[in-house]
Amino acid sequence: MSPKTLYDKIWDAHVAHEADDGTTLLYIDRHLVHEVTSPQAFEGLRMTGRTVRAPDKTIAVPDHNVPTTLGREKADNMTEDSRIQVAALDTNAKEFGIHYYPVSDIRQGIVHIVGPEQGWTLPGMTVVCGDSHTATHGAFGALAHGIGTSEVEHVLATQTLIQKKSKNMKVEITGKLRPGVTAKDITLSVIGHTGTAGGTGYVIEYCGEAIRDLSMEGRMTVCNMAIEGGARAGLIAPDEKTFEYCMGRPHAPKGAQWEAAMSWWKTLYSDDDAHWDKVITIKGDDIAPVVTWGTSPEDVLPITASVPKPEDFTGGKVGAVQRSLEYMGLTSGTPLSEVEIDTVFIGSCTNGRIEDLRAAAEILKGKKKKDGLRAMVVPGSGLVRAQAEEEGLADIFKEAGFEWRLAGCSMCLAMNPDQLQPGERCAATSNRNFEGRQGRGGRTHLMSPAMAAAAAITGRLTDVRDLM
């Protein structure tokens, strides 16, 4: 048998049918659903008289549109479109008998945090969702990626998906990370190295000592942004950390089923002589705390750098940089550490887990945010929120002057009440800094939770190492 990558192994195990041209019908183990990309899909089932093929493998959570303030069940601070979408998900989940975590359930949260938290995400699975950041689940050694609404309907009806196989790409982060450098700095640095199109046509496997050293939550952060690097999905081979995380979760296998699953999970790694179509190697100690400066995730630099000049670039990038600087209101040559901010957002499916909140609280403990600055922490799930309150993290945030919110996607995207106003500048732990992503005219700088906390204290982009 020829050597295989982790991606090869998972793919081959899920092929239901393959045509001569490589078009493949792939079996799907888990289908995650939220309120924005699912209403038309469920309506399509009704129109054709179909049911959900595997309701026991379909999990629904409202997250994109839901407000994160107390009293949100009343829905009086949602737009009409948002109310309709959340109500539709509630109706569809009940009618079609799928697993559902409504807003009133403490287990509700961002779908990519709820899935792993509840044990729905397991090694070797195929996982899809009508959301681009489904790649998050690749941290478990699961083949996970986003799909469109028509594909959502197809998976609901058949539990399969028509696909063509991607190429294999290895991203190796060698050695150890330096103090103050986090999983978010890794994933942003990789995108800065490859560009947002560097992974197009590939599934990325992240490996190396620095990746192995990460916790499961850190690995989820890395895989979450594989899509920003252009990749179809991101993967990390499962190991003892993975198995320990999964054990005992509500929907993880138990007893003999656990042992049987483990016997397969332990084979989920890339063989030594497996073929890679592309390999990128980055030294862990070359990675510094980073921030984005422009309107693409590839516009990333160490916090110690300065705003770049358009003439430092070539080709079409020159004009793109000029437009980015104009939109962001930045002047070339300005040290990034002198860029003042108006807002801090800590949360999202990239950095809304308990370890992210711990990292931010560690920087904020005993300190206050800068006067006049708006700052909020939005836990990724109700369970994360409860744990943070139990650990005293919520008190640290509130004493520092932060708003302590309920779970949801929040200010990651302008689809709910948490938005930037035109011209406002935000230090954000989310995953996209596109024009208008956080609100029309809003300016977004991506960074780690610790870096965002540091920025809240000083009121400007700040090297967290100066506060450690």
UniProtKB/Swiss-Prot annotation:
MF (Gene Ontology): 3-isopropylmalate dehydratase activity; 4 iron, 4 sulfur cluster binding; metal ion binding
Cited function: Catalyzes the isomerization between 2-isopropylmalate and 3-isopropylmalate, via the formation of 2-isopropylmaleate.
GO BP terms: L-leucine biosynthetic process
Quaternary structure note: Heterodimer of LeuC and LeuD.
Keywords: 4Fe-4S, Amino-acid biosynthesis, Branched-chain amino acid biosynthesis, Iron, Iron-sulfur, Leucine biosynthesis, Lyase, Metal-binding
SUPFAM superfamilies, sorted: Aconitase iron-sulfur domain
Domain of life: Bacteria
InterPro entries the UniProt entry points to: 3-IsopropMal_deHydase_lsu, Acnase/IPM_dHydase_lsu_aba_1/3, Acoase/IPM_deHydtase_lsu_aba, Aconitase_4Fe-4S_BS, Aconitase_4Fe-4S_dom, IPM_dehydratase_rel_enz, IPMI_cat
Positions bound to [4Fe-4S] cluster: 349, 409, 412
Protein name, UniProt field: 3-isopropylmalate dehydratase large subunit
Entry's cofactor comment: Binds 1 [4Fe-4S] cluster per subunit.
Entries under HAMAP family matching the protein: LeuC_type1 (MF_01026)
Pathway: Amino-acid biosynthesis; L-leucine biosynthesis; L-leucine from 3-methyl-2-oxobutanoate: step 2/4
Catalytic reaction(s) noted: (2R,3S)-3-isopropylmalate = (2S)-2-isopropylmalate
The keyword Heme is annotated on this UniProt entry: no
A Pfam family that the UniProt record links to this protein: Aconitase
Cofactor(s) it depends on: [4Fe-4S] cluster
EC number of this enzyme: 4.2.1.33
Annotated family: Belongs to the aconitase/IPM isomerase family. LeuC type 1 subfamily.
